[in-house]
């Protein structure tokens, strides 16, 4: 019997088995030891028609807590930002609706130009010479930057601040383990990197120094001083940065960063749990040929018309295989398009205004919480800051959910020393009323 959605009949199965020379499905898996194979039938419910199935799925979806149902003060790498309506309209067009970067430029000029614009805007925001077409997310961008540094310097020691997002550091450790690289983590002092410890750790074997700006605790690192520590050494200076903050903050390129990486989720990509993000990777011209991922370049055809092509492809794994700069090639072209459309819709003034509202609203919330007697950790911050509570953050967040709020990130999940510490994010979407109500609620729960 054929199935509406699984068109594999018994006749189809028989024909396929005859083609590969087996008599049963079990023979197909004979290399798997029988003792570890599942025996019997799977406990799968009977199939449903479309209407009751949709009803069941909707009931499951309604259990989710989202920024549409609750007011969110959660950040830590994924943020609730304004997304211009035009973003979904553009990325839903069939011409664009793919994550794949095109190999045939003559039929893909629109998509190639969109990627080129993404690269251009990222390079401008970061103050760097060039940027690639995108990476999987901020974590892979961060780890790939370390791999580039190790390959370029031929050193194997990676120095990374513990003020970098812990998930990015976890990805870095995964990359480093397989290549027998040494990762040295530098402690945090007063919500920023311990500069004395960082300076002492740098030696002739160091491939790179890696920090985040603004860092995981929301604080602004002293990039100028950190860059000075690498002068006279082979070590590259790598900065992971929230690109929206660079509409307001001095870009890392102006401090002499060699590589700037991060996550473009803040531009046009909804906050979700485990869904696709869009990493970015920017570099100096000196390191351009060692960058991972696709690069779109501008050129002219034989009639003198402007055109766009995938360029410097000899770096990539589909040509050089084991000698490629990275295994990353096609990845997040669709989300890069979303980020491009969002940045274009906002414009320079809009990105500045968005970043400024984040800063001002976060500062308002910080000052109000200090006035109310909360212990707010000191530091110059952007749109996130740390508050120490009298009770476990998990308990406070559970109570906040019942009141219609998504609380901040529980830093106790990162390190025990941050037990009862909450990382609070304030974006341009939060109103004064929401901020004041949140403070009142946590004041009661913290008593």
From Swiss-Prot:
Gene it is expressed from: gcvPA
Function summary: The glycine cleavage system catalyzes the degradation of glycine. The P protein binds the alpha-amino group of glycine through its pyridoxal phosphate cofactor; CO(2) is released and the remaining methylamine moiety is then transferred to the lipoamide cofactor of the H protein.
Reactions catalysed, as given in the entry: N(6)-[(R)-lipoyl]-L-lysyl-[glycine-cleavage complex H protein] + glycine + H(+) = N(6)-[(R)-S(8)-aminomethyldihydrolipoyl]-L-lysyl-[glycine-cleavage complex H protein] + CO2
Family: Belongs to the GcvP family. N-terminal subunit subfamily.
Top-level taxon in the UniProt lineage: Bacteria
Protein name: Probable glycine dehydrogenase (decarboxylating) subunit 1
GO terms for biological process, alphabetical: glycine decarboxylation via glycine cleavage system; nucleoside metabolic process
Disulfide links within the chain: none
Enzyme Commission number, as recorded: 1.4.4.2
Alphabetically ordered keywords of this record: Oxidoreductase
Stored HAMAP family: GcvPA
Gene3D superfamilies for the chain: Aspartate Aminotransferase, domain 1, Type I PLP-dependent aspartate aminotransferase-like (Major domain)
GO molecular function: glycine dehydrogenase (decarboxylating) activity
Organism: Macrococcus caseolyticus (strain JCSC5402) (Macrococcoides caseolyticum)
InterPro entries from the UniProt entry: GcvPA, GDC-P_N, GDC_P, PyrdxlP-dep_Trfase, PyrdxlP-dep_Trfase_major, PyrdxlP-dep_Trfase_small
Family matches, as Pfam families: GDC-P
The keyword Oxidoreductase appears for this protein: yes
Subunit and partners: The glycine cleavage system is composed of four proteins: P, T, L and H. In this organism, the P 'protein' is a heterodimer of two subunits.
């Amino acid at each position: 019997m054929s199935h509406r959605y699984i068109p594999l009949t018994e006749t189809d199965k028989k024909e396929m088995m005859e083609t590969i020379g087996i008599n049963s499905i079990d023979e197909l898996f004979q290399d798997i030891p029988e003792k570890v194979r599942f025996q019997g039938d799977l406990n799968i419910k009977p199939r449903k028609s479309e209407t009751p199935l949709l009803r069941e799925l909707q009931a499951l979806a309604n259990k989710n807590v989202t920024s549409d149902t609750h007011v969110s003060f959660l950040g830590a790498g994924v943020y609730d930002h304004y997304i211009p309506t035009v973003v979904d309209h553009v990325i839903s067009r069939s011409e664009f609706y793919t994550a794949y970067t095109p190999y045939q430029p003559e039929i893909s000029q629109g998509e190639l130009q969109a990627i080129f614009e993404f690269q251009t805007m990222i390079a401008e925001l970061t103050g760097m010479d060039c940027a690639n077409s995108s990476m999987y997310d901020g974590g892979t961008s961060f780890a790939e930057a370390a791999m580039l540094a190790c390959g370029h310097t031929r050193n194997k020691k990676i120095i990374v601040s513990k003020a970098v997002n812990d998930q990015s550091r976890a990805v870095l450790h995964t990359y480093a383990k397989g290549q027998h690289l040494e990762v040295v983590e530098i402690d945090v002092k007063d919500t920023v990197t311990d500069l004395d410890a960082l300076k002492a750790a740098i030696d002739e074997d160091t491939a790179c120094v890696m920090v985040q700006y603004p860092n995981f605790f929301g604080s602004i690192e002293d990039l100028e001083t950190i860059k000075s520590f690498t002068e006279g050494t082979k070590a590259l200076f790598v900065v992971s940065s929230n690109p929206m903050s660079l509409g307001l903050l001095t870009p890392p390129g102006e401090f002499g960063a060699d590589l700037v990486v991060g996550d473009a989720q803040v531009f046009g990509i909804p906050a979700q749990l485990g869904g696709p993000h869009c990493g970015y990777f920017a570099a100096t011209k000196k390191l351009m040929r060692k960058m991972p991922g696709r690069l779109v370049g501008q050129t002219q055809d034989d009639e003198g018309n402007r055109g766009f092509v995938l360029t410097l492809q000899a770096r990539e794994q589909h040509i050089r295989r084991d000698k490629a700069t990275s295994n990353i090639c096609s990845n997040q072209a669709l989300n890069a398009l979303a980020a491009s459309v969002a940045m274009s819709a906002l414009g320079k003034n809009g990105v500045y205004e968005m970043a400024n509202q984040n800063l001002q609203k976060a500062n308002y919330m910080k000052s109000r919480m200090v006035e109310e007697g909360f212990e707010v950790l000191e530091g110059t911050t952007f749109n996130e800051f740390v508050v120490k509570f009298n009770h476990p953050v998990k308990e406070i967040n559970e109570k906040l959910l019942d009141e219609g709020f998504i609380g901040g990130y529980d830093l106790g999940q990162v390190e025990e020393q941050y037990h009862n510490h909450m990382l609070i994010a304030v974006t341009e979407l939060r109103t004064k009323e929401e901020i004041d109500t949140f403070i009142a609620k946590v004041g009661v729960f913290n008593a």
